């Protein structure tokens, strides 16, 4: 779809699950998007700087959302030394 200026504008941009890389469908009403703010040395949120994770309803229904979020946050350097039974 194009707007009046001739620029390509999409009405729906599909998201991917951060944990499984599956496309989150438009009818997946149990999926969530979580934004975690970056903080400065004093512990205050930096405006406009955050890390976004999208979790599909499939992951949430299996009870894997908390483990997936911990794993993703560790990979991005937001968490360290989180216990996991798989280690």
UniProtKB/Swiss-Prot annotation:
GO terms for molecular function: structural constituent of ribosome. Gene3D superfamilies: 3.30.1230.20. It is found in: Cytoplasm. One of its GO terms (biological process) is translation. Keywords: Cytoplasm, Ribonucleoprotein, Ribosomal protein, rRNA processing. GO terms for cellular component: cytoplasm; ribonucleoprotein complex; ribosome. It comes from the Eukaryota. Component of the small ribosomal subunit. Mature ribosomes consist of a small (40S) and a large (60S) subunit. The 40S subunit contains about 33 different proteins and 1 molecule of RNA (18S). The 60S subunit contains about 49 different proteins and 3 molecules of RNA (25S, 5.8S and 5S). Required for the processing of the 20S rRNA-precursor to mature 18S rRNA in a late step of the maturation of 40S ribosomal subunits. Has a physiological role leading to 18S rRNA stability. PANTHER family: 40S RIBOSOMAL PROTEIN S21. Belongs to the eukaryotic ribosomal protein eS21 family. This is Small ribosomal subunit protein eS21. It comes from Kluyveromyces lactis (strain ATCC 8585 / CBS 2359 / DSM 70799 / NBRC 1267 / NRRL Y-1140 / WM37) (Yeast). The lineage of its organism: Eukaryota, Fungi, Dikarya, Ascomycota, Saccharomycotina.
